[in-house]
Amino acid sequence: EINNIKWEVDMSIPNSKDFFENTIEDFDSIVLFSHVKPDGDAYGSSMGLKLALQGLFPEKKCYCVGSYDEPMPENFEKPIKPGELSIDIIKNSLCIITDTGTKARIEDPRALEGKFIVKIDHHAPDDHFGDLEFVDEAKSSCSVIVADMLFASFPVIPANAASAILLGILSDTDGLKLALEADDFYKVGRLIYNGADFYKTYHSISSNSLKDIELNKAILNATKIEGKVIYTVFN
């Protein structure tokens, strides 16, 4: 029960409880990775899980590797750049790869050199890799799967983890406009009750930079209308 609201235990991700109780416990260090040209869901799922594990298992060393550099609230933690984390750490760690459908799309391929590899994803499972997979292509984002897994075992997660996961969900669902099911809203509610700041997070990913405005202007200026057809031509 959080803030006088009773939340149901989520068991929609099979074996996730065993993952936290056994797999995590076997390692002293954990490294999170995601895909090339990382978007908000790549950041939210990897950094969100890293921060959650860091708070829930304070005796373990947790790292997040990625080049995500899109707008986000100032207090959000930035990942370690690909190639900067010692290969010795990676080889002796549990490596978790999120939001990445194929091996070829892993941003830092050294992730596959980890001692034990876990894949968490919501894309069609065309390329199976790793020692353990949590894949549900019916989910709107990988960050929702991470939230599912965490809430199946922990009623409360760190606020900074909740905020990062929220960013991932909002990013992949265009601010919940593309949410696939009521569960997306339910998970967002739980994240907010765990300390995520909806307004700051939504504002950070929905604000347009001058570069974005200039690009939109160029697209609109190149738009043609013929009858009921609207199209854009770029030279």
Label each PLM-derived region with a short phrase.
Residues 37-38, 102-103, 151:
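Short beta-turn/strand-loop junction motif enriched in small, turn-promoting residues
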Residues 122-188:
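Short alpha-helices
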Residues 77-132:
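Active-site cofactor/cluster-binding pocket
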Residues 7, 12-79, 86-93, 171-235:
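Hydrophobic helix-and-loop "lid/oligomerization" segment in the mid-to-C-terminal part
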Residues 49-50, 112-115, 135-136, 187:
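Glycine-rich, phosphate-binding/catalytic loops in enzymes
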Residues 3-4:
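Intrinsic-disorder-associated, low-complexity terminal segments enriched in Asp/Asn/His/Tyr and depleted
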Residues 58-60, 115, 155:
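Short glycine/serine/threonine/alanine-rich loop segments
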